[in-house]
């Protein structure tokens, strides 16, 4: 089955809030064993309403059923400066599969491939960065299978992350 990506809308807020309560989503967003919600209680209505070319969310669907989400940001320009000082012309991604029964079917690979292709369709984008938790070794393997390479550990807020990077040249070489 093929994944379709579409812009997130305010109609998706209840779904995103529900996914935030699922243990597998929480486990990918924090190492805090007492956490009861993913993404530190993000206000999804505010996030979606603030969508721009600098930061926006997509919903992944299979046969019209939402199964996951992605966030795409320009880490140099986004207002929270989560990534700190970074070079220009990067994109940063977050991905999560919300529906438990959609895990392990290759949908994440389809989601990432579509978004990576879209990011590199902009000739100014030189690389994509991503920050899985250092403890999330499944995510490390997933990103490395897509061609991302480890840059190193970094703490974001209170999270110990292992930053990965995919350079345009490496992606293009893998697509030949």
Task: Label the model's feature ranges.
Residues 1-2, 7-45, 171-176:
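A short, well-structured alpha-helix characteristic of acyl/acetyltransferase catalytic modules
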Residues 39-102, 118, 168-170:
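Acetyl-CoA-dependent GNAT
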Residues 102, 106-115:
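Conserved acetyl-CoA pyrophosphate-binding loop and the N-cap/start of the following alpha-helix
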Residues 109-110, 134-152:
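Conserved active-site alpha-helix within GNAT-family acetyltransferase domains
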Residues 119-131:
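Conserved GNAT acetyl-CoA-binding A-motif
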Residues 129-140, 156-160:
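Conserved beta-strand-loop-alpha-helix junction that forms the acyl-donor binding cleft
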Residues 145, 153-176:
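Terminal substrate-recognition subdomain of acyl/acetyltransferases
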